[in-house]
C-alpha cells in the first residue's frame, strides 16, 4: 500500500469517527452492554435506562489501573462506563455476598466476584441495606456477571451520568 493510500485511509477513519461523535453516536465494545451502536440522548436518568456515567476519581483511578476502563475525559482520565440504572431515590438496595436485592427482590447476575478476570482480588461495597438518596443512582449490568458496577463501588451521584443511550444496532 502506498503512503498516499495509507494517509487517505487514516484520514477517512478519523473523519468518520469525528462525524459519528458529533452526530451523537457511540460504539460500545465492552461486555457491560451489548456490543453495538448507540445514540446519545439527553434527559434525566430513569430506572432501567442505559446510561453513560463517569466514575468518581478514586474509583476511576483504580478501574483504569486494573484495565477495566479505557482512557477518556472523565475524572481520573477514564472513559464513561455504560451501565443500566438499577435504583434511584427512595429505592432500597441490599448488598449481600449472594448479590443485590432491590426493594427486597433479588437482582439476577449480581453475585459479587471475589476475583477479577486477571485473578486479582475484588473488594465489594460493604454488606448492608441502603436507601438511595435523592441525588444518587445505583448502576449495574444485566448483560455481564463480570461487570465493574455498583456492587463494587456503591451509588453514584446523579451528576456523574453524562447521558442516556439508546441502542440502534447491537450484537447479543
Which residue stretches match the model-derived regions?
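Extended hydrophobic leader/signal-anchor segments used for secretion and membrane insertion
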Residues: 1-172
